[in-house]
Amino acid sequence: ALWKDVLKKIGTVALHAGKAAFGAAADTISQGGS
């Protein structure tokens, strides 16, 4: 079904966005945390 492909695509985009946001947050914390 088409909606399954849509949900899968949204999930993939969300996963990549989450990884990018987490990576940016980790970089910020490691650089200026302490």
Swiss-Prot record:
InterPro entries: Dermaseptin_dom
Highest taxon of source: Eukaryota
One annotated Gene Ontology cellular component of this protein: extracellular region
Keyword Secreted: yes
Pfam family, one: DD_K
Signal peptide segment: none
Tissue: Expressed by the skin glands.
Main location: secreted
Swiss-Prot/TrEMBL keywords: Amphibian defense peptide, Antimicrobial, Secreted
Cellular localisation: Secreted
GO biological process entries: defense response
Record-stated family: Belongs to the frog skin active peptide (FSAP) family. Dermaseptin subfamily.
The protein's role, per its UniProt record: Has antimicrobial activity.
Protein name: Dermaseptin-H5
Species this chain originates from: Pithecopus hypochondrialis (Orange-legged leaf frog)
